[in-house]
């Protein structure tokens, strides 16, 4: 497996040089951590490749490409593998700046999906569905988690029905069962939010088992939001007809950051070859979350990385990463 990341131009979510430098150090720490487990390729904007190489250190491939931002999960392709023969392809979602938000720019980022597929040497299949990689999560056995406020967002896909969205997604991913969450975390609807990405709320640990963000403190609006979401997950069945086992992952103790409701979440992790790169927040619950993920993934090394600078820019570790599966032996692409 190979990780793709990005180092773009100054982003709207990073207003000052200090914020940019802090975020880029965090981005680099994630890339270096993943490099311990698998190859890493980072896309860098024009004139930024040399600085990226200096920041990332040896062993990380840097490729110069025009970029608007750096959220590779959302602007990159979603790689898929055909079960019968292991052949790979890439879904190139239509990207429009998370619903054409006024602060977003996507002239270059809308092309990244196809460019990354070309770097990987696989065929890219362009889909007319406006979607981002952080807006879905699959179990590898036919089930996909979605959010009503993302795929059915009128600023993304005006007039699209749930059935139409499912048909497009199932055709591309090879899934057959969608579990729709009603919304995302409160903080994700702020100015630089995605309007409900699932990858900060819930993720499959393995088929039949979902980790779900919970907010123990009733003073935070996500306390009720998470109760609703976990209720939906517990009532759902996957593509095999199994009820989902829901493993609750309590949020960090901090409730507000810079006057806004915190959406710090341990769910936004990255699985790599033999490892789990886990968000950390210098919080008392960091150790509890790391222990929980070690129990869930006993054959992987769990490595916490301070994700606060990444969250300050609008996302987490999963949001800045995109995995390319290794080709099956004897196949091309």
Which ranges hold each PLM region?
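Histidine/cysteine-enriched polar flanking segments
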Residues: 1-333
């Amino acid at each position: 497996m190979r990780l793709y990341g990005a180092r773009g131009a100054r982003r709207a979510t990073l207003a000052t040089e200090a914020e940019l430098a802090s975020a880029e150090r965090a981005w680099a720490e994630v890339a270096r951590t993943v490099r311990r487990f698998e190859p890493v390729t980072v896309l860098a904007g024009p004139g930024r490749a040399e600085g990226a190489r200096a920041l990332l250190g040896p062993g990380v491939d840097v490729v110069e490409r025009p970029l608007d931002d750096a959220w590779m999960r959302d602007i990159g392709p979603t790689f898929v593998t055909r079960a019968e023969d292991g052949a790979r392809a890439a879904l190139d979602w239509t990207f429009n700046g998370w619903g054409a938000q006024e602060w977003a720019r996507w002239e270059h980022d809308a092309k990244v999906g196809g460019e990354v597929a070309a770097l990987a040497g696989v065929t890219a299949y362009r889909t007319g569905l406006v979607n981002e990689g952080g807006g879905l999560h699959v179990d590898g056995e036919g089930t996909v988690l979605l959010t009503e406020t993302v795929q059915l967002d009128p600023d993304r896909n005006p007039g699209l029905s749930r059935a139409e969205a499912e048909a497009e997604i199932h055709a591309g991913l090879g899934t057959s069962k969608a579990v729709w969450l009603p919304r995302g975390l409160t903080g994700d609807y702020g100015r630089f939010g995605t309007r409900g990405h699932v990858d900060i709320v819930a993720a499959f640990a393995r088929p039949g088992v979902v980790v779900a963000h919970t907010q123990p403190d009733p003073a935070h609006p996500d306390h009720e939001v998470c109760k609703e979401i976990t209720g939906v997950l517990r009532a759902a069945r996957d593509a095999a007809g199994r009820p989902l086992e829901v493993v609750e992952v309590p949020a960090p103790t901090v409730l507000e950051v810079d006057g806004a409701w915190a959406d710090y979440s341990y769910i936004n992790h990255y699985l790599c070859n033999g490892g789990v790169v886990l968000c950390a927040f210098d919080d008392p619950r960091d150790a509890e979350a790391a222990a929980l993920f070690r129990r869930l993934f006993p054959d992987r090394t769990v490595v916490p990385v301070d994700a606060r600078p990444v969250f300050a820019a609008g996302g987490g570790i999963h949001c800045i990463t995109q995995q390319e599966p290794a080709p099956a032996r004897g196949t091309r692409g």
